[in-house]
Each structure stands twice: as structure tokens, then as C-alpha cells.
Curated annotation (Swiss-Prot):
Protein name as it appears in the record: Large ribosomal subunit protein bL20m
Location of the transit peptide in the chain: 1-9
Annotated organism of origin: Homo sapiens (Human)
GO molecular function: RNA binding; rRNA binding; structural constituent of ribosome
GO BP, one annotated term: mitochondrial translation
Subunit structure: Component of the mitochondrial large ribosomal subunit (mt-LSU). Mature mammalian 55S mitochondrial ribosomes consist of a small (28S) and a large (39S) subunit. The 28S small subunit contains a 12S ribosomal RNA (12S mt-rRNA) and 30 different proteins. The 39S large subunit contains a 16S rRNA (16S mt-rRNA), a copy of mitochondrial valine transfer RNA (mt-tRNA(Val)), which plays an integral structural role, and 52 different proteins. Interacts with OXA1L.
CDD domains reported for this sequence: Ribosomal_L20
GO CC terms of this entry: mitochondrial inner membrane; mitochondrial large ribosomal subunit; mitochondrial ribosome; mitochondrion
Source taxon at top rank: Eukaryota
Compartmental location: Mitochondrion
Keyword annotations of the record: Mitochondrion, Ribonucleoprotein, Ribosomal protein, Transit peptide
Amino acid sequence: MVFLTAQLWLRNRVTDRYFRIQEVLKHARHFRGRKNRCYRLAVRTVIRAFVKCTKARYLKKKNMRTLWINRITAASQEHGLKYPALIGNLVKCQVELNRKVLADLAIYEPKTFKSLAALASRRRHEGFAAALGDGKEPEGIFSRVVQYH
């Protein structure tokens, strides 16, 4: 490639500016009013939207955890247990299910959740040895209870 003049050798900065503006306006297309047409307004709005998007990722996690806890609380109260008692006694019985799985079990598998609540209730009232009973677990649940002989 041969450049005959110095002007052809230098970069054309106008096209860079054009594509930079179009990139911002592309993100602002769905905004209402002048914010999707005027570059100066679009830049502010797009930056603000990106900041809110970043914060919303953490809020979503927090809101989902609150939702799971509310669902587990409601389901455990149907079986006569409070939420802290249910979670604490399931941990003591070495049932390693997180809140998301417990909330899903409470909604879609109520019999399984009922047996988990029964296990936690027995552990609460009688202790770990009584929770194991005769060495069998309640029907319909799987846990990682280690039995020592």
C-alpha cells in the first residue's frame, strides 16, 4: 500500500466520532423523548441506566433470598414450626438443602417438605438420636445423615 500524500497517511477522526455516538444511541433507542435522539441527553441516561443495572444485580439476589425465606416460613408454619427452628434443626440433622431448594420443595413437593418438617420437629423435641428413630429416615426424603455404630 502506497500513500502518496500526508493527508491520506493520517487517520480520519470523524468516522471514529460517528461510530462512538452511534454506539451510545444504540443503547438509548428504547428510551422515551429526546433521550433516544440527542447525544448529549443520551449519554447521561445510558450511564445512569448502566449504573442502575449494576446495582440491580445485587438487589435481585437479595430479593430472591427474601422470597425464598418467606415461602419457607409460610410452609413451615403450616406444619407447626417457625423458620429458625426448621433451618436450625435441619442443619443439626445434616440435611444440606439450601433455601432455594427448600422453597421449591415447599411449593412443588409438599409431602417431601412435610417429611423434612417432621424430621426437624423430632430433632427439636427429642434430640438427634430420637430424630433417627430406629435408624430409618421418614419416607420420601434423602439426607446425608451419618450413622455411627
